[in-house]
Amino acid sequence: LMIDCYMALDVPYSIDLANAVKEANLFWIEEALPPHDLESHKHIKRACPWQKWSTGEHTNTRYGFRNIIRDRSVDILQPDLAYAGMTETLRIAAMASAYDLMVIPHCSGVYAYNFGISSTVTPFNEFINLHPTAEKIVPIFGKIFTNEPVPVNGEVTLTDLPGFGAEFNDEVELEEI
């Protein structure tokens, strides 16, 4: 179980939240603070050492992650592959590896899955279910790909096709996207 705060908290509230949910044993609290407020991140991490903290969906280059990594101000880095791209995210992961930090992309789909299997610091990937009622699992990219993998019993099977292993659906109309 994780909580995403979308940069909405301050230091006292972050600490109060971590204390209030301590018994829930959350895997992480995500983006409690703006990603570049490193001093505040270090403060909440020191105040609540049992809690893993994550950030990164609004930081999309290795240069933005450099100080976050060096200062160890969070436990988990979450670049968004849709913005950072595969090459830059692999560079971020290489930097994180030297500090024993996890990288769990803030996105789902073929890009994140392929990154996950190529990274030694990514123990799992997120899956964000975009079905309107969440009653079934649907492809992240809708009808754009003909063979986009979706999780089955918590696992994703990737193809051995070139690139990201997904084939574009030539039949899809722009209005459907």
Roles of regions detected by a PLM:
Residues 14, 41, 172-173:
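Hydrophobic/aromatic residues in well-formed alpha-helices
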Residues 1-21:
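Loop-centered beta-sheet repeat module
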Residues 162-177:
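Extended hydrophobic packing segments that form well-structured cores
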Residues 19, 25-28, 36-155, 159:
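Shared catalytic-loop signature of beta/alpha-barrel
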Residues 1-5, 31, 55:
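Conserved hydrophobic beta-strand within the GNAT/NAT acetyltransferase core sheet
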